[in-house]
């Protein structure tokens, strides 16, 4: 994970609840129910994070999910309204293909992936879920893919050449 050079409390973050699940723990006296919430937060300007919260009440689970998501914020490198290059994000059984798109294309993505991309502020992108359709795996795979993105300047710096030489 990249080193954080920003303060999550100074960003104007909005949150989106992706999934709420009722989970059960079986104990000697019967079943104990609680709720699990998968939440994505972002400032719609390049910062995004996802988190899980679990509690007996739904609002408390969502609050915990938001706190967890703020701890896991990443900065997404963007070129205009899309991403710099194609990438496949992987997490567990989840695989998500992310492709840059021309301006005006919109966000072509399903459910959990769309939530992450919209919170990140990406307006034009093509995606395809290749693996598991579990919401948590898809969200984490999307964030893993976004975290691996590099701009042309970063690639040139890593290779020790200029951006002009890199682009031909």
From Swiss-Prot:
GO terms for biological process: translation. Residues 13-76 form the S5 DRBM domain. Signal peptide: none annotated. GO terms for cellular component: small ribosomal subunit. One of its GO terms (molecular function) is rRNA binding. InterPro entries: Ribosomal_Su5_D2-typ_SF (IPR020568), Ribosomal_uS5 (IPR000851), Ribosomal_uS5_bac-type (IPR005712), Ribosomal_uS5_C (IPR005324), Ribosomal_uS5_N (IPR013810), Ribosomal_uS5_N_CS (IPR018192), Ribsml_uS5_D2-typ_fold_subgr (IPR014721). Keywords: Ribonucleoprotein, Ribosomal protein, RNA-binding, rRNA-binding. Transmembrane segments: none annotated. The N-terminal domain interacts with the head of the 30S subunit; the C-terminal domain interacts with the body and contacts protein S4. The interaction surface between S4 and S5 is involved in control of translational fidelity. With S4 and S12 plays an important role in translational accuracy. Located at the back of the 30S subunit body where it stabilizes the conformation of the head with respect to the body. Part of the 30S ribosomal subunit. Contacts proteins S4 and S8. Belongs to the universal ribosomal protein uS5 family. This is Small ribosomal subunit protein uS5. It comes from Natranaerobius thermophilus (strain ATCC BAA-1301 / DSM 18059 / JW/NM-WN-LF).
